[in-house]
Amino acid sequence: MKNLLIFLVDDDAMQNQMLRDHLTLELDDATIDVMETGEACLAQLDRKPDVIVLDFNLSSRQSSALNGLQVLEEIRIKHPSAEVIMLSGQDKLDVAVEIMKNGAFDYVVKSETAFLRVTSSIRKVMASRKLKRQLAATKRLVGFVIAGFVAIVAFCLIVWFFIPEWIPERRIRLGLD
């Protein structure tokens, strides 16, 4: 796995530290930065994180703070290639649907298996990106093959129509032999 940049954004410092410790053990070559506000995350987007694990309810300390959905919307505008995994204490289907409609890669409910699900989602993000890179490489290769085929056909047509003396049967038809 290449060096990943992961942002953990949660206003619960203990939750952040536990998740960071878990991910550090589970993911090789990952740089994990912890932020306690959505605003701090948005200010760091120029660092181009691969994955952002974002708490849905970020306004528990400051009522004026952006919530997770607002931060997600800003991330989609400013750094659309970052994959966002929304972490929430809410187990409500309508919230999960809204989050996914707004472009989250996954929605994980805070529970005893949440850290395992976050790890699994991060691995899925990386597998998806690897497949996209492989698909792009395959498309480029197919483009080269098609271009080569077109060049060969063009060469054959040029030879056939413009240089008849190279082809023995055409030489005979043209009375060159």
For the regions a protein language model found, what residue spans apply to each?
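Conserved acidic carboxylate
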Residues: 10
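Short amphipathic alpha-helix used as the core "switch/output" element in two-component signaling
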Residues: 57, 61-81, 98
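Alpha4 helix (beta4-alpha4-beta5 surface) of REC/receiver domains from two-component response regulators
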Residues: 66, 70, 91-108
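C-terminal output/effector regions of signal-responsive regulators
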Residues: 136-177
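Two-component/phosphorelay signaling modules centered on CheY-like receiver
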Residues: 13-33
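Acidic, metal-coordinating helix/loop segments flanking the phosphotransfer/catalytic sites
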Residues: 34-51, 56-59
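Receiver (REC) domain switch/output surface
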Residues: 117-129
